[in-house]
Amino acid sequence: MKTIYLCEKEQDLRRVFDTNDRIYCKADVLQSPEAFRETEYNFSTWGMPVFTEEEIKANLPKLKAVFYGAGSVQKFARPFLNCGVKVFSAWAANGVPVAEYTVAQIVLANKGFFRAMRYADRAKATELFRKYPGNYGVKVGIIGAGMIGKMVIRKLQDYCMEVLVFDPFLPDVTAAELGVKKVSLEEVFSRCQVVSNHLANNEQTKGMLHGGLFSAMLPYATFLNTGRGAQVVEADLIRVLTDRPDLTAILDVTFPEPPEEGSPFYKIGRAHV
């Protein structure tokens, strides 16, 4: 919280608001409602608790706005909106470092970095490097062309790569403007050297990425997940990584997060968590 809100421009924040920079949880609000009844603005981030409309009206009657220093507000926003409280999200700003991180991993993965870095022996590393195609003319798959997916696509335009996209909701005209080719989910996995997941976070996308897709990946391909861990059938991914020693997985997210103690992800050298 303090890193997000009270770092570079703390003085600006304090000029606008009489800021209390303590960190509170939902239990604090419910146990001492009198301390929060004059609160007009709330600053939160990942882990924002869910309040009912009744709890908001009873404990935060003067609340005007919630500032959420992260992405999606779907989990908690509706009761606040129904009470007339405005909700602001940093979803666009939050997407920038995610897109930058994604592109960096794609470039490194296409060069075989994540495999070769494990070898102190230069000859072995060089032999492994040769199994990877590099970044010139390579196919990269993007699953989900939402805000972050589009950011990644635009940043990849600086490279000579062919970008294949799976997104049923991406208009053909937008795909043409982005210079990408729309294909099926199966084609993304079977034709691309790196597959990067940016699916929307909802019930329909849970478990969408399964073993059949991972098994169809190209030799020495890489799966990169910065979307949501629950969108991957992780038992399938573990099985395929075990059966296919040529594949690599870069997992910025898992489910649960972090993986449970003893998870195979910690033991598979080609899974970077």
Task: Label each region the model flagged.
Residues M1-Y41, T45-W46, C160, L164:
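N-terminal glycine-/charge-rich "phosphate-binding" loop or analogous flexible N-terminal tail
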Residues A35-Y41, L60-L63, S190-V195, L218-A221:
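Short acidic/histidine-rich motifs immediately flanking catalytic phosphotransfer sites
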Residues E40-Y119, Y132:
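Phosphate/diphosphate ligand-binding glycine-rich loop within oxidoreductases
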Residues G47-T52, L170-P264:
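Rossmann-like adenosine-cofactor binding region
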Residues N59-A65, N82-V85, C160-M161, P219-A221, ...:
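A short helix->loop->beta-strand "cap" motif at the edges of active sites that frequently abuts
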Residues L63, Y136-K139, G211, Y220:
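Phosphate-coordination loops involved in phosphoryl transfer and adenosine-cofactor binding
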Residues R115-M151, D158:
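Glycine-rich NAD(P)-binding loop of Rossmann-like domains
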Residues A271-V273:
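Conserved small/polar residues in nucleotide/adenosyl-binding loops
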